[in-house]
């Protein structure tokens, strides 16, 4: 069974095309015109073992907000499409990732109900020209469009780059876990029979 999706989003603010293979090898080709986001998406693909291609153009002359948020929307939609009815998947995933002085933990439930818990203190407002508050916008958009519970907690950390990198890596690993097929699971992992 192929667990792939291609999603396009065209608005007056952005044009995005994203292709995703959940059962990939961690290969990425990302060009968003937002260098820090490119870096985060590349490592997201690598650590989740997803094949990911993203091509995005946006109104970055204003700021990165629309581009970052819309990529979160499209990635959430692609994950949701690729998972189909979620038959046989584990549903839950959790990962803790250290990066030097930082420790981030992410828990995921592919429940069909969107909720983001974001307990991340960022000691700076920018990494280069990237507004770090946009990370939350990305995670919220992904959460809403994947329709998942995602809890992101940073226990400690001082370097804002390390903090966000650990969050993206932990999310990737938690999603990899949650999306894995388990041969013991018949149908979906719910007593309701539907996710």
Swiss-Prot record:
Top-rank taxon, per record: Bacteria
Transmembrane segments: none
An annotated GO cellular component: cytoplasm
Any GO MF annotation of the entry: imidazoleglycerol-phosphate dehydratase activity
Localization per record: Cytoplasm
Pathway involvement of the protein, from the record: Amino-acid biosynthesis; L-histidine biosynthesis; L-histidine from 5-phospho-alpha-D-ribose 1-diphosphate: step 6/9
A Pfam family per the record: IGPD
Coiled-coil blocks: none
Keywords (A to Z) from UniProt: Amino-acid biosynthesis, Cytoplasm, Histidine biosynthesis, Lyase
EC number: 4.2.1.19
The protein's name in its UniProt record: Imidazoleglycerol-phosphate dehydratase
Organism of derivation: Geotalea daltonii (strain DSM 22248 / JCM 15807 / FRC-32)
Protein's gene: hisB
């Amino acid at each position: 069974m192929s667990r792939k999706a291609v999603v396009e989003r065209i608005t007056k603010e952005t044009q995005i095309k994203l292709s995703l293979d959940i059962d990939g090898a961690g290969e990425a080709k990302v060009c968003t015109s937002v260098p820090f986001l490119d870096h985060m998406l590349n490592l997201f693909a690598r650590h989740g073992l997803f094949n990911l291609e993203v091509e995005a153009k946006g109104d970055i002359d204003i700021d990165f907000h629309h581009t970052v948020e819309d990529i979160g929307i499209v990635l959430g939609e692609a994950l949701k499409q690729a998972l189909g009815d979620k038959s046989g998947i584990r549903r839950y995933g959790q990962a803790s990732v250290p990066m030097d002085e930082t420790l981030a933990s992410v828990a995921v439930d592919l429940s069909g109900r969107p909720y983001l818990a974001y307990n991340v203190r960022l000691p700076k407002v920018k990494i280069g020209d990237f507004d770090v508050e946009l990370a939350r916008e990305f995670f919220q958009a992904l959460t809403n469009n994947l329709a998942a519970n995602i809890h992101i907690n940073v226990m400690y950390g001082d370097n804002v780059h390390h903090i966000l990198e650990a969050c993206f890596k932990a999310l990737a690993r938690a999603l990899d876990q949650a999306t894995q097929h388990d041969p013991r699971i018949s149908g979906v992992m719910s007593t309701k029979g539907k996710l």
